[in-house]
């Protein structure tokens, strides 16, 4: 068995090095990886209605049909194939989409074997990361800046553009023809990439493919943004669209660097712009600078033209607003953040003269947004839209221990997530709602009133953990740049990675 696994990983590694992916689509072990490894759960078991053995038989039949000529496209109207699709009408596209997702990730993956010493070190540092590392970053960096722009990364992007971009990463023409055919025939592309309120609203069958395509698109756009950041002093806005037309784009970049190195490195004098800070989180980004708003407008135009000419995505200029930090505020990862000016007067005396000196200091405030949180709690049936706690009837059939444990788990998760807030009054209100919801659920189960239930059981000892402060929270750990991203961090491009995010945080 170990020899077979070694052979599988060897074939995958060879395909990655040679950028030849087409044969992997017809390998059964690719779909075995989907089934047997930790890829956000198995698509076979999540769709129910059949056991694992029968689903693996479907995979073998699927591979056989793919090997046969003129059997790639399966029509739902074909009566001979209805029996094959009788388990689940979406099963075929689910299996293939998961297999495609694994194959296209191969040329972009840094290593395949997760048991190496380096990956253990990386995994260890990932466990040290916390959402609380964001706030020292903002206090140390953004509070000293004057202008900030907070906007959403525009999408959807056209399928054909993504396929063309991916061709620069792997030189396998048959695979990309098959990839294009598959996306057009089997995936409902409009549902796959149409913008929603949150990524979590996408169906589970398409989530892995969507996340790969979206992250690949963001990676491509940020790599170009970094090039712009380093060479912006040599680019004029009028020539920007010519440079970023898609035809021979990478050749233009190489030619630009070549010309600059030969002709301009010693003779051209220019004004070097100060740093632009760039932060990406979820589906949004932040641009911040200490300089005048003119520089921020320049970068705003650069990004709009980059999306327009390179990705054929239109972004409304009026949706990207540039605000002063002292006047603007923004939502970040479930928090409401703004910079407040603290003014203080200091008396200074020199000999017989005294002076009053006004000192202005910036302070970052991170507030728990109570209204969106109550809306999320109401949607989860813990309270009504006004924030009044209600019972959770679907949990009333569980034991008392499991009911209390479920509520406490949610409460602890929210406490871990929102303990970085500078004002915790809203957090205490959320915990109060969960506490009363738990009491009402227990009273409903025992067919009693809340008052009688508390008097009989005693509320202080039973539910004291709801208001117990966390003694130790893993926080204030900001991940340093890895060897592959040192250039990004030196260029003021920040990646704030979050290991855990509670579902209730996605308010939008």
Swiss-Prot record:
Its main location: plastid. GO terms for cellular component: chloroplast. The keyword Chloroplast applies. It is found in: Plastid, Chloroplast. It comes from the Eukaryota. GO terms for molecular function: RNA binding. Keywords: Chloroplast, mRNA processing, Plastid, RNA-binding, tRNA processing. PANTHER family: MATURASE K. This is Maturase K.
């Amino acid at each position: 068995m170990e020899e077979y696994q070694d052979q599988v990983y060897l074939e995958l590694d060879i395909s990655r090095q040679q950028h030849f992916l087409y044969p992997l689509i017809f390998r059964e072990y690719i779909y075995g990886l989907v089934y047997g490894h930790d890829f956000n759960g198995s698509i076979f078991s999540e769709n129910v209605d059949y056991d694992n053995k029968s689903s693996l038989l479907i995979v073998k039949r699927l591979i056989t049909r793919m090997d046969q000529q003129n059997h790639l496209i399966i029509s739902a109207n074909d009566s001979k194939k209805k029996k094959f699709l009788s388990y689940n009408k979406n099963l075929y596209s689910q299996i293939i989409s998961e297999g495609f997702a694994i194959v296209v990730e191969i040329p972009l993956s840094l290593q395949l074997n997760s048991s190496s010493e380096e990956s253990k070190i990386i995994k260890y540092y990932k466990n040290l990361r916390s959402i609380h590392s964001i706030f020292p970053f903002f206090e140390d960096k953004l509070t000293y800046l004057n202008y900030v722009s907070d906007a959403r990364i525009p999408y959807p992007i056209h399928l054909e553009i993504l396929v063309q971009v991916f061709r620069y990463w792997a030189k396998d023409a048959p695979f990309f023809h098959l990839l294009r055919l598959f996306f057009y025939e089997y995936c409902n592309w409009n549902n796959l990439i149409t913008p929603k309120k949150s990524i979590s609203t996408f169906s589970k069958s398409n989530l892995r493919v969507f996340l790969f395509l979206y992250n690949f698109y963001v990676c491509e756009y940020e790599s170009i943004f970094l090039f712009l950041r380093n060479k912006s002093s040599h680019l004029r806005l009028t020539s920007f669209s010519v440079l970023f037309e898609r035809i021979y784009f990478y050749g233009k970049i190489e030619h630009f660097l070549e010309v600059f190195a030969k002709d301009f490195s010693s003779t051209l004098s220019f004004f070097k712009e100060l740093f632009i800070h760039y932060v990406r989180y979820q589906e949004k980004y932040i641009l911040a600078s200490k300089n005048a708003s003119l520089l921020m407008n320049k970068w705003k135009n650069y990004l709009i033209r980059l999306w327009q000419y390179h990705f054929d995505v239109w972004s409304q200029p009026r949706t990207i607003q540039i605000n002063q930090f002292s006047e603007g505020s923004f939502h970040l990862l479930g928090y409401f953040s703004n910079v407040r000016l603290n003014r203080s007067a200091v008396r200074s005396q020199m000999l017989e003269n005294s002076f009053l000196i006004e000192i202005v200091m910036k302070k970052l405030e991170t507030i728990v947004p109570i209204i969106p949180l109550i809306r999320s709690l109401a949607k989860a049936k813990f309270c009504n839209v006004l924030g009044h706690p209600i019972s959770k009837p679907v949990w009333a059939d569980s034991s008392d221990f499991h009911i209390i444990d479920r509520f406490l788990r949610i409460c602890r998760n929210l406490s871990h997530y929102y303990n970085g807030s500078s004002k915790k009054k809203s957090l205490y209100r959320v915990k109060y709602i969960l506490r009363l919801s738990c009491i009402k659920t227990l009273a409903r189960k025992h067919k009693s009133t809340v008052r009688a239930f508390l008097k009989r059981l005693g509320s202080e000892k039973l539910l004291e953990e709801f208001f117990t402060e966390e003694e130790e929270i893993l926080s204030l750990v900001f991940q340093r740049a890895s060897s592959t991203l040192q250039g990004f961090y030196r260029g003021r491009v920040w990646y704030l990675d979050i290991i855990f995010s509670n579902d209730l945080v996605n308010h939008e």
